Amino acid sequence: MKVLILVLLGVVILQAAPIRKVENLLPTRNPPQNELVYWCTYANQCDFCWECIHGICRNRIQADWPVIHQNDWIINCTVSRWNGQCHYYEGSQQYLHHEMDCINPTSHTYPHTEYMKIYERDDL
């Protein structure tokens, strides 16, 4: 009986303990390279997710995204992580703040993708 109680107590403790500790990340405009997939899924309009050459931009992470013209849809962002909460701040003048549980990410794509200026071959 005591063994059963100890086993059950151990299971409860293991379930209550966090499985993975995520390190804090101070506010940055350049998240670590190994975290770009995460941040660019969460905040895909951030400038660190795009590579722009001569006004034509490609998404660095998501190859299936369209090639777009460099425009206001791509914005400056600052990202951070503290105590399991992930944050990103969009814009350089007036910040919009988004927050989520890092383990359960939610995309906050704003402005919506219909504001992207998709590059067409006829645009040359």
Swiss-Prot record:
Disulfide bonds: none
Keyword terms, alphabetized: Glycoprotein, Signal
Endpoints of the signal sequence: 1-16
Superkingdom of the organism of origin: Viruses
Key word Glycoprotein present: yes
Signal listed as a keyword: yes
Positions glycosylated per UniProt: N76
Record-stated family: Belongs to the asfivirus MGF 110 family.
Function noted in UniProt: Plays a role in virus cell tropism, and may be required for efficient virus replication in macrophages.
Protein name: Protein MGF 110-8L
Species for this entry: African swine fever virus (isolate Warthog/Namibia/Wart80/1980) (ASFV)
